[in-house]
Amino acid sequence: PQFGLLVTHNEAISIADYYTVKGENGKPEFRPTAHYAYHPCNSAVVSLDEMFGNAGSKPRKTHVLHPEEILDGADELGVLLYGHKKNAYWFGSTLHVEEAVKLAPLQNATGLQVTSAVLAGMVWALENPKSGIVESDEMDFRRCLEIQKPYLGTLKGHFTDWTPLSGRPGLFAEDIDTSDPWQFRNVLVH
């Protein structure tokens, strides 16, 4: 399980749009829910807690870490597809800081994985000049992944029996839906 922050992200909207099934009347009969969740490093989480504990006021003094200050760790970037017959499948990449610095000395693992997508988009645009402006979902994912692979670290996929109900309820009663583990209220942490 991962405790993450839900963040607005274009793919969370475009993926849901792409897989929406409309009925004869044009209204959606099925629309999947797509979330973008992010969990910053522990120091950043503490900083966010302090900021929100201070009514959301930005601290007077801030410090952005430079790549040489990040000594250890990895960035895991992936997708969890859930709610199907095999329960859930995670596919993603793990890029360790040491590997990121070897590939691009002034980068970190998170930055390198993100900028690899920008590079793939630029190459795709150069190779498809007549396509115009498109959503990232409309690009050839195989070609993009081919460009990105050297910058993503280890790519893995595996099935899991984990659900948001695993280990719940805990010490206190919760408002959870035990009939369907993948309901949104089971994902939220209150």
Language-model features: where?
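C-terminal catalytic/substrate-binding lobe primarily of soluble NAD(P)-dependent oxidoreductases
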Residues: 1-190
